Amino acid sequence: MKEFWQTCVSRLEQELPPQQISAWIRPLVPLAYDEAQAVLRVAAPNRFKLDWVRKNFSHQIEALAAEWYQRPVQVTFELPGTSSAPRIPMAVPRPVAVSVPAVVAAVQQASEPAPPAPAPAPAAPAPAPASADAANIVYERSRLNTDLTFENFVTGKANQLARAAALQVAENPGTSYNPLFLYGGVGLGKTHLIHAIGNAMVAAGTGVRVRYVHADQYVSDVVKAYQRKAFDDFKRYYHSLDLLLIDDIQFFSGKNRTQEEFFYAFEAMVAQRKQIIITSDTYPKELSGIDSRLISRFDSGLTVAIEPPELEMRVAILLRKAESEGVPMPEEVAFFIAKHLRSNVRELEGALRKVLAYARFHGRDVLTVDVCKEALKDLLSVSNGQITVENIQKTVADFYKIKVADMYSKRRPANIALPRQVAMYLAKELTQKSLPEIGDLFGGRDHTTVLHAVRKISDARAKQAELNHTLHVLEQTLKG
């Protein structure tokens, strides 16, 4: 048993990053192996780690146990003290654990005014800490979603740089990438990544004070602090965090008092080498209604784009999601769905749920391409058409948050002229329409106007990285 567990840990070290080994595998303690029942019992230090290991690593441990014992083995996880069976000693070193009371105290201190220091008292034996309760307190205060981890984040060309940066931040918070600014369209995995960072840091067991907050909630916190005249408490809490995760910061637009308070929190945390991670739907300099001081601070760290997933990545996402649902999905079925639905991860997952529900309600035990065609016929009728100028106009208008009617109008403000020129450029690049035909579809404009727009955007694309990125995103959205 002892020899097996040492071999198991060694094998997992070859498959998993060091941080995961330290956070999840080394804290486990093998208790016993029941030869008759082929059951391996393993203890986890608290409920938080137990649930996580059972969900993310049990299949790997069971596979290694089956290989070692030459038979299928069931691995069960339990908390210390739930059984009288003796523990098996391990030669593998384990990290020093932070006491649960210290974690609880740190969390409480982060959210409440510090009470007066109590008078010294004689040392007394401490009661056994409620590990599961402490883990739950950390989780509830952090507002992290424990389902969003690095382990179940599908990586491809569209997000590999963002994932690499996120891993680096999780392992070395508050150093070179501070703040980390992730931007991209809806449903591309920004929220998943920042939760993964928070979960990894909490799991490392160092008692870090973490808070995930959507920008709207932060605004609400500021308003409540103002109404209750409790800004000192508000500042004490946010300034004391080790990791602050702000999602969709574009919602700070026009909220001057919120931006002012966030600026103070930002300055305080960075000065203490505490990590800040921000997501947005656009590049920092393209944020409207945001104080220039904040935009300057955002640019001082690392800014990484997450783009729409390419075909191979979309297939991998579908296969991973189907596996998590316990449903076998042939690769050709995943390929069919991925080929026709191209915009983002949420759309893919929604389509998969629709297919699974259709198959279940109609008694289809096996997923096939025909089942997908039936289940997704409404979605496919929209996505199957060729790229048209009308589709380009709508996609560009949605991206720049203007009306489609602005594409045909004679108005020329900058916030309309640029999107219109971008749409003309894409119409020339992605359709077979002639310049006069494109001009007609843009409110009867002359072909020389279209030619001017095409040349202007083409030249600017070669010189401006932000515009090139925008065009790349639009092209991939339109043609997959």
From Swiss-Prot:
Keyword field: ATP-binding, Cytoplasm, DNA replication, DNA-binding, Lipid-binding, Nucleotide-binding
GO terms assigned for molecular function: ATP binding; ATP hydrolysis activity; DNA replication origin binding; lipid binding
PROSITE patterns, sorted: DNAA (PS01008)
GO cellular component: cytoplasm; plasma membrane
Positions annotated to bind ATP: G187, G189, K190, T191
Protein origin, superkingdom: Bacteria
Region feature (Domain IV, binds dsDNA): 360-480
Localisation per UniProt entry: Cytoplasm
Region entry Domain II, spans: 71-142
GO biological process, one term: regulation of DNA replication
Keyword flag Repressor: no
Chain segments carrying region Domain I, interacts with DnaA modulators: 1-71
Annotated spans, Domain III, AAA+ region: 143-359
A Pfam family: Bac_DnaA_C
Keyword DNA-binding (UniProt): yes
Entry function: Plays an essential role in the initiation and regulation of chromosomal replication. ATP-DnaA binds to the origin of replication (oriC) to initiate formation of the DNA replication initiation complex once per cell cycle. Binds the DnaA box (a 9 base pair repeat at the origin) and separates the double-stranded (ds)DNA. Forms a right-handed helical filament on oriC DNA; dsDNA binds to the exterior of the filament while single-stranded (ss)DNA is stabiized in the filament's interior.
Subunit and partners: Oligomerizes as a right-handed, spiral filament on DNA at oriC.
Free-text comment about domains: Domain I is involved in oligomerization and binding regulators, domain II is flexibile and of varying length in different bacteria, domain III forms the AAA+ region, while domain IV binds dsDNA.
Family: Belongs to the DnaA family.
Protein's recorded name: Chromosomal replication initiator protein DnaA
